[in-house]
Amino acid sequence: MDDTILRVDDIQKFYGNKGNLTKAVDHISFSVRKGEFLGIMGSSGSGKTTLLNCISTIDTVTSGHIYVEGKDITTLHGSQLADFRGKKLGFIFQDFNLLDTLTAYENISLALSIAGTKPSEIQKRVPQIAKALNIQEVLNKYPYQMSGGQQQRVAAARAMVTNPAIV
């Protein structure tokens, strides 16, 4: 059984026009199996953010293919792309992007609400993920009432609560 969750196959990304091309990603290939963690390291300007933007469908590749659970995401457009982002990706932003007017519980449950999850399921899953990340004590707090580490774990909970293929 192939448990490859992500396969990046010979991708390239260029910016600019024909007379002034910048190569941001040059023939990158790798795969990640379910449960594995991947770290991407490199100097400034080496293409790390561009690579992640292509994997997350924020940007498109110039050539090559990216497969998530065997599906070529470089061919997705419109509603297929929106559906993929909503169901298969979980984002944790560097600055967390928690909504200041919502409690931790509401920030986490928002991802489930957007995904169309039933309220009874939301009431079950939010406490489960909060327990797993040891943030039960902040569920009724607003972001300004939490430490940076607590905010980071709430953002991680929000990204993971929908069980995406990739975080």
Model-derived features: positions:
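ABC family nucleotide-binding domain
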Residues: 4-167
